[in-house]
Swiss-Prot record:
Binding annotation for GTP: D19, H20, G21, K22, S23, T24, N136, K137, I138, D139
InterPro entries per record: EF-4 (IPR006297), EFG_III/V (IPR035647), EFG_V-like (IPR000640), EFTu-like_2 (IPR004161), G_TR_CS (IPR031157), LepA_C_sf (IPR038363), LepA_CTD (IPR013842), LepA_IV (IPR035654)
Residues of the signal peptide: none
Family per similarity comment: Belongs to the TRAFAC class translation factor GTPase superfamily. Classic translation factor GTPase family. LepA subfamily.
Catalytic reaction equation(s): GTP + H2O = GDP + phosphate + H(+)
Record-annotated tr-type G domain positions: 7-189
Xref: Pfam families: EFG_C, GTP_EFTU, GTP_EFTU_D2, LepA_C
HAMAP family: LepA
Example of a GO biological process term: positive regulation of translation
Location in the cell: Cell inner membrane
EC number: 3.6.5.n1
MF terms in GO: GTP binding; GTPase activity; guanosine tetraphosphate binding; ribosome binding; translation elongation factor activity
Protein name stated in the entry: Elongation factor 4
Amino acid sequence: MTTISQKFIRNFSIIAHIDHGKSTLADRFIQLCGGLSEREMKAQVLDSMDIERERGITIKAQSVTLNFKSQDGHFYQLNFIDTPGHVDFSYEVSRSLAACEGALLVVDAAQGVEAQTVATCYTAIEQGLVVLPVLNKIDLPQADPERAIQEIEDVIGIEAHDAIRVSAKEGRGVKELLEQLVVAIPPPVGDPEAPLQALIIDSWFDSYLGVVSLVRVKAGTLRKGDKIRVMSTGKDYYADQIGHFTPKRQPLEELSAGAVGFVVAGIKDIFGAPVGDTLTHAKQSAGSPLPGFKQVKPQVFAGLFPINSEEYEPFREALAKLRLNDAALFYEPESSEALGFGFRCGFLGMLHMEIVQERLEREYNLELITTAPTVSYEILAKQGEMLYVDNPSHLPEPGKIGEIREPIAVANILVPPTYLGAVITLCVEKRGVQKKLLYLSNQVSMTYEIPLSEVVLDFFDRLKSASRGYASLDYSFNHFQAADLVKLDILISGQKVDALATIVHRDLAYTRGRELTERLKDLIPRQMFEVAIQAAIGAKIIARTSVKALRKNVTAKCYGGDITRKRKLLEKQKAGKKRMKQVGKVAIPQEAFLAVLRVKNE
């Protein structure tokens, strides 16, 4: 296949909220440009993971190269990079945008603009991309294109009066959209003769090939068999295979400046080609690496432990392979008295955490226990040193703490006026402080400062229920703020269970302690002796309940006779139970650890 001239290449991605029809539009592009035969087409071609197809969301960014014949008679090479729409995967979006010159802003004509789309669109504009507004789902009876155009102009602030109207489901307007795209989005720039600079947008591990990297060539030309160098590690490899996805893997002889494609260089080390790194030639290397992506900081932390302790090694390998494919996942070894050895993992949000756990269980056949998620707290010790704690059991003694500061997030919410009251009530309940309220044409834009610990747990779900699914949310960490926080310990039979400890606000500690002990009472199986469940702040017990003992009727064999005979048997039973209580261990089921998560949802 001959290398196409740079002026006929267009690199673009699609910005859209969940359910606005992004993956369906991608399917139409592939169909129209003949990327796959009719027999090979299936709905959501690019959502390759089972989880993506089941949940109807895009998690990983995918890339496709298509050939499009325009009305002007020229063939254009369209490199399309699909992006996720959920707030937890926003870092995937910024990586995709770094490889493009333009973006299609797809808005559902019936639903209008969502908060998430606004945030991603600003990222694209900041990176200097040309943004092309597109109205999708115009075939729906409730579609209101005029209102959607007004919202794009009011909320995002870009011209949208000539936005292209399409119905991805029916294929209407898709050809016109591609024609417009070829004209509006500029071709890539970069000298094919310069020293090679290729940005790694994504990497994944293939058990046969090793590390496969998705790259955007910014300058120079990469040929098959070239000796290439990964700039951050300084290690050299040979480019065994290069090519692009149509969406099938298609080998090529070279990728020159402006192209997007994959490289297989026989890298067996999982961390051999980190995302955001630069590839260059080993002999004529580029002077400096390309600016990568800003490192994403995990927001939610939880302990993951294998149920079977023999699975610790396979679990570690699985995490390493997943980390290659998911740059935002962070992990470090951790041991718990209750759960044994495992890892403390950092995620971007609750959906990210669920997806990671589900991928580990499905793709690597592991059985895992998750502890309650927490956020990272800033602690000023009395000696003046600053600590960051993301695990409640690592919190210093109350006497050594000068001040605990919790992370505060700025949440931007877009909601129809009808549900404004319910959403404000929810924000107040979550200890939110209103910063801004703005009435737009058909929606209200609200800005709140809410503690991150409240946002990451169940705020998104609660917001959706409060607004019947109409509200949309975008949040980002802003700063740390001093708060009256305490560590809530759970004691079972007088023993602290480290995996059940949580950090809560003092005002909520009593209610939370009572709810937790009640919930655990239902989940811990009854023993031959009474099991006390207590919630404590430091040495002070704030709630207590107990699991009653199973009772064996030892006096059943006594018919009539002396009362002292019965008393003797009862005393003997009592002494046995007391002895049992001292040595007896209580097995805590997996549901009990999850109870900590669920108390908040009710």
